[in-house]
Amino acid sequence: MAPAQALPGQATDFTYYLRTTLSAESRGFDQILLNSSAGLEVTGLRVDGAAVAVRAVIEEGGVRLDLPQMMRRSALVEIDFRSTLYLNQTRFDAFLLNSALGEAVRQQADAGDATPEVASEAVAVALPAGRHLIDELRLSAPLFTPNGDGIGDRLGLEFNLLMFYLPRPLRVEVFDLGGRKLRSLSQTEAEAGRVGLEWDGLDEGGRLVPPGLYLLRVEAVGDAQTETVSRLVGVVY
């Protein structure tokens, strides 16, 4: 598949190359299952360079592609899809199925040189080497006005959580400038992915905080490191 590398947290277009080699006795296939721990959206499929209309069915752990007719010949199949990755070496595994035989009968595609036009033979995508667990922390605004008028009443925050192969502790908290914790927005275990939260301007007791500057702190606890990222946010009326 290509490309073999991607940037974390950014939607990337990939192409998966399958070289099918079928004998005269083969019953062929009319379905392709593309499995991954990452979500994906199939945008096109070609057989020997010719576009083929397929039906994409979302299944647990991947997407099943239903071909319009049985494939009983050797060919180069190219699957275009879009995915956003948060884990290094995310795998994409392809399986060939014959609908007449049921889903229990499947042939996994082996990694290898499907076409000389693509240098990569891998079925996993690498992310750039780095030590960050938290990436692309963004606030909906530098300040907000939680006065109940329905305009700018909530502060939104989003960030990428990277390299969490298993659920790990994630804490998102609000402090005043004196270091006193006012509100916990998240104290749970999370997996790698895009995280979105909101603060309504209230403290833990449900009281509206006074106008001023506050510190928003995100802390991710990994196996080998703990990373903390902070942002200042203003509350005004």
What is each PLM-predicted segment?
Residues S37-A75:
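A surface/secretory-pathway sequence property marking extracellular, secreted
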Residues M1, D93-G130:
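Extracellular/luminal low-complexity Ser/Thr/Pro-rich, glycosylation-prone repeat/linker regions
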Residues R64-L97:
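Low-complexity, intrinsically disordered segments enriched in Ser/Thr together with acidic residues
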Residues M1-S26, A126-G148:
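Compositionally biased low-complexity segments at domain edges in trafficked proteins
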Residues R73-A75, V123-Y237:
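Short loop/turn motifs at secondary-structure boundaries
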Residues G9-R46, L170:
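Low-complexity, serine/threonine/proline/glycine-rich extracellular segments that form mucin-like
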Residues D30, L34-G49, F81-L85, A94-A100:
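A eukaryote-biased signal for long
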Residues L18-A24, L34-A38, S83-L85, N160-Y165, ...:
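Extracellular acidic, Ser/Thr/Pro-rich low-complexity tracts
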